[in-house]
């Protein structure tokens, strides 16, 4: 899972926006089952053809895996069809639980008042809150809107950095060396509320 799409710029074969920065992780073990089922359910929902639906049981291997490390990985799916904002709630939860630091990387920053409140409140209580956004935009209008959020966040202690070598398409977060996320959800309305996406959260303790 991660931000990669199947296009040349994602692998720096072409360079329309400078150096393209993205992230992805390879999943192994039981967590893959959950992600496979979520993908197939969304595939079926989008296809809307009963006769061509993919049966999850056909693609999921029923095999027990021995954990290699402590902690857990929790895949989850977000969808505009169920009225729940799982992606945003996970980000807000991380900001609320963070004690030392909470860092985000996102290509677009267009957030709700609730997300803004969580980030600024964390910064006010002494948490090191940082956000990395692209220094070179792929969409100029969205880039302008992204920058319009800087002032209020910085005013309340959130640190914002722009990755200047090119376009940063990564969507990741990490907090206190205990919580981390990597997936396809940006910190923006469209991604948080209107995408059918897969995401994963990893807690080390």
What are these regions (language model features)?
Residues 1-201, 205:
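Charged, low-complexity intrinsically disordered terminal segments
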């Amino acid at each position: 899972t991660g931000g990669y799409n199947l296009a040349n710029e994602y692998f720096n074969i072409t360079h329309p926006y400078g150096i393209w920065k993205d992230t992805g992780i390879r999943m192994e073990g039981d967590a893959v089952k959950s992600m496979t089922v979520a993908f197939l359910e969304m595939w079926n929902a989008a296809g809307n053809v009963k006769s061509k639906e993919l049966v999850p049981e056909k693609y999921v291997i029923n095999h027990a895996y021995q954990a290699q490390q402590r902690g857990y990985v929790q895949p989850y799916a977000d969808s505009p069809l169920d009225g729940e904002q799982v992606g945003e709630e996970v980000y807000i939860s991380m900001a609320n639980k963070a004690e030392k630091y909470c860092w985000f990387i996102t290509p677009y920053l267009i957030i709700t008042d609730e997300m803004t409140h969580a980030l600024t409140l964390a910064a006010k209580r002494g948490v090191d809150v940082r956000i990395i956004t692209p220094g070179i935009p792929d969409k100029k209008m969205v880039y302008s809107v992204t920058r319009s959020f800087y002032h209020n966040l910085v005013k309340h202690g959130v640190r914002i950095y722009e990755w200047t070598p090119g376009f940063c398409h990564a969507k990741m977060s990490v907090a206190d060396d205990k919580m981390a996320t990597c997936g396809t959800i940006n910190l923006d309305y469209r991604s948080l509320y209107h995408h059918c996406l897969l995401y994963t959260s990893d807690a080390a303790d």
